Amino acid sequence: ADRRHSRVAERIGGNFPPVVISDRSNGDFEFDHASQPDYIYIGKEDPENLPDNFRLLVDAHFWKERPNAYPFFIASEIDELKDYSVPLKFIRLTYRDLTDRVIEVLKQDKSVIVILSTHHRNGIAAERAAMHHLLAAGCDVPVILHRDYRETDIEALQLKAAVDFGTLLLDGFGDGIMLHNEGCETMVTDSCMFGILQATR
């Protein structure tokens, strides 16, 4: 399927290849240089503790202005987006958060990227519904597909993630992916994401 048209913010969206965002909020900063993620989510960690060349997502209230560090918001913080003038802002939303008012903010603020999350039993359907909702509203915000797992078995994680992400990517949805898993090393999760993107190119 053709990829959904999204605007470009920095190098996310448009015709840029989908990005990988690695969730390192657990404080694990070991990387496999063969599969270096495009962005790293560090949660409440102090961005000063990491090298400048890492592009970091930092929880908005812990964010500090420095090269390559971007604030990460949750749905309840939508009204705070306007207080930050940075080239990129990330906000984690679910399908249910996409009210008319929220969509209006996403349309107006061209620096925003949505991290689309789901707690729904049928996550694929929920994320697909969210993408169709954005399309119907004429909202071209770039969207990163996000999933949470609790898998200790690497193969089970790979299979589950390949279906959950791959189905939507092959439908033309998603300007990147972000996978959080309790149970495996973070480098395993990263290589799983790179594998999914290679398989869906």
Predicted regions: what they are:
Residues 1-78, 82, 88-95:
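Active-site loops and adjacent core secondary-structure elements that bind or stabilize anionic groups
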Residues 7-13, 67-70, 76-79, 85-201:
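Catalytic alpha/beta core domains of metabolic enzymes, predominantly
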